[in-house]
Each structure stands twice: as structure tokens, then as C-alpha cells.
């Protein structure tokens, strides 16, 4: 299983705990960071620095098929995820008729700001791109131009026809602070997404599921997984 996680220098601990949470439930998972400085050095990314981007991986996530040599399936997720079930269950949902599969959220942010005081920009299909199961060999990705397309075109999957964009269960991109009121009585999250900021930020240290994240953090330290 090939897994890429967006890396931001301000969220080092979030990345490490996300990585640990994946491998806790699936020890043979291959987890790699997408670091903007590295993909620039590789010549894969040459966009100007976007001062409005909330994270360093805002657009580099769409390099996942290229980083995977356009072979097989890859999972991308933001670093503010905490996996509490085996990610293999997610890969088992991969359907080759789709170019990519996502949780198709329908929600509006509660605030104009998000993690670390960043501006919250509303747009269609918001948060769909925070977790993507990529079919790297699908012909649609020939039209994916990470350096040339606008941020809106990328985050709204404009290079993929609607019929080629599959849907994943909401449990795998559980928006912390949003979905408990809607779904908690009938569904249990499989992967928590601290989309407005997690316990690693002072201003959101007491968010929902903060104790669970800290539990994984302590386990991560004990297992010498954080460097």
C-alpha cells in the first residue's frame, strides 16, 4: 500500500502522528511525506509560492500520481488525519473504473478562519481533496497539470469527468467538529480529520477527539516513531 501524506513544516507533529496511526493498524504500509521543497528539487513543482495557501501541500498533493510513477493505486491524505482503523479497508474499496475516489462532503465551514489562524476560503467540493484514493494508471491523469491549472481547478478535480470520480464512505474523512451532530448515532469514524486545527495548535488544543490524538501521540513517542 502506497500512501502519501502532505507535510507542512508547522505541522511536523501532526505528520508524525498521522504516519504512526496508519502503521499502528497496518504495519506494512509505506508512508511517505510530500514536502514542497523536495518536489521542487525533483523538478515536479515550479509554481510561485502562494501566500494564500493554508498549507505547504495545498497543491503538491496532486503530484501523487506522478510521485507514484503512474502505477497502481495510491492514497493521499492531509497530515491532520488520525487513522483509527486499518487503511487496507480503504484500499479494498478501490474501483478501477474511477480515476480517483473521495468523500464527497456537503458542508459549509463554521468559521472564516481555520487552523493556525489561516483564512478559510469557501469553494465547491471543499475538503474533497483532503483524502484521495488515486487510480494512478487512469487515462484522466494525462490531463492533470499541477503547475498550470488554477487552485480551484485542481481542488474541484476539473481534469476528471464526474462519472470518473468515485465516492468513499464519510467515515474515512470524518470532519472533526462537523459530523458528530449529523452521523455519530449511526456511524463510527474510521479516520478523523482535524480540518479546523488539531491538538498540536494552541488555539485548538481542546478540540473534539483531542484526547484520542494525544493518546496516539504518546504511543508514538513511546514507540520511538517521532524524530
Residue map of PLM features:
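A glycosyltransferase accessory/donor-loop signature
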Residues: 1, 10, 26, 33-40, ...
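Hydrophobic targeting segments
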Residues: 2-5, 22
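N-terminal beta1-alpha1 ligand-phosphate binding loop
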Residues: 4-16
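Short, acidic, metal-binding catalytic loop of nucleotide-sugar glycosyltransferases
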Residues: 21-29
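Active-site-proximal specificity loops/subdomain of glycosyltransferases
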Residues: 31-67
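Short, surface-exposed amphipathic charged segments that create phosphate/polyanion-binding patches used
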Residues: 45-52, 114-119, 183-185
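GT-A fold catalytic core of metal-dependent nucleotide-sugar glycosyltransferases
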Residues: 60-109, 133
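Conserved catalytic core of nucleotide-sugar-dependent glycosyltransferases
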Residues: 93-155
Amino acid at each position: 500500500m502506497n500512501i502519501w501524506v502532505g507535510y507542512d513544516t508547522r505541522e511536523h507533529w501532526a505528520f508524525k502522528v498521522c504516519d504512526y496511526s496508519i502503521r499502528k493498524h497496518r504495519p506494512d504500509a509505506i508512508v511517505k511525506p510530500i514536502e514542497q521543497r523536495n518536489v521542487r528539487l525533483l523538478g515536479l513543482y515550479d509554481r510561485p509560492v502562494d501566500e494564500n495557501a493554508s498549507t505547504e501541500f495545498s497543491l503538491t498533493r496532486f503530484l501523487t500520481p506522478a510521485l507514484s510513477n503512474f502505477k497502481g493505486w495510491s492514497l493521499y491524505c492531509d497530515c491532520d488525519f488520525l487513522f483509527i482503523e486499518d487503511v487496507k479497508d480503504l484500499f479494498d474499496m478501490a474501483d478501477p473504473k474511477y480515476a480517483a475516489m473521495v468523500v464527497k462532503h456537503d458542508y459549509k465551514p463554521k468559521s472564516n478562519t481555520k487552523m493556525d489562524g489561516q483564512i478559510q476560503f469557501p469553494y465547491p467540493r471543499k475538503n474533497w481533496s483532503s483524502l484521495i484514493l488515486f487510480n494512478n494508471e487512469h487515462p484522466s491523469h494525462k490531463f492533470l497539470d499541477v503547475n498550470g491549472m488554477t487552485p480551484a481547478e485542481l481542488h474541484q478535480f476539473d481534469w476528471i469527468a464526474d462519472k470518473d470520480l468515485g465516492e468513499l464512505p464519510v467515515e474515512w474523512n470524518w470532519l472533526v467538529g462537523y459530523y458528530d451532530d449529523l452521523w455519530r448515532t449511526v456511524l463510527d469514524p474510521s479516520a478523523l480529520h482535524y480540518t479546523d486545527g488539531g491538538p498540536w495548535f494552541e488555539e485548538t488544543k481542546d478540540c473534539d477527539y483531542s484526547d484520542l490524538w494525544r493518546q496516539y501521540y504518546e504511543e508514538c513517542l513511546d514507540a520511538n516513531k517521532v524524530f
